[in-house]
Amino acid sequence: MGVFSTLGNHDYGDYVQWPIDGISKNQNLENLKQVHADMGWRLLMNEHVILEKNNEQIALLGIENWSAKANFPRHGKMKEAHAGTEKYSFKILMSHDPSHWAAEVVTQYKDIDLMLSGHTHGMQFGVELPGFKWSPVQYMYKQWAGLYEGDNQKLYVNRGFGFIGYPGRVGVLPEITVIELV
């Protein structure tokens, strides 16, 4: 079926002064898109693909970064990605920022069954014990790690394995998630 990806807030280079080493902001983004292609990844940019197995079909939607937080620009166009998916009974959305779920997905796109997100990194700091998880990121993001459910929709927020700022983690382990659809 392949590997699919979307862009997150840092991928656009909005936080630095351009040009850098003679490369423009737009060229940097194009270079990043090419890296995805060179790795064999299909970068979904406000679009969808249909995955098929055993005569079953799933619509996989991927949008550019969309955030409900004021600091992050909205590049994502959910309407474009969603167009043409109405006939598919199961839809998965890849959207980098989990704030997108409550702000738009659950209110305007009730037919999205599962949203896959990241962005928070669990703030790379927290406490996880059986039945208890805490991180200061929860004061900024209600959905910051793990599975969340609302009505007939689900959101999974992956804490990732990278970092932002401090190059380490305390109490919040890196994560690679495997989700099996049956």
Annotated model-derived regions:
Residues 1-182:
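Soluble catalytic domains of enzymes that build or remodel membrane lipids, polysaccharides, and related
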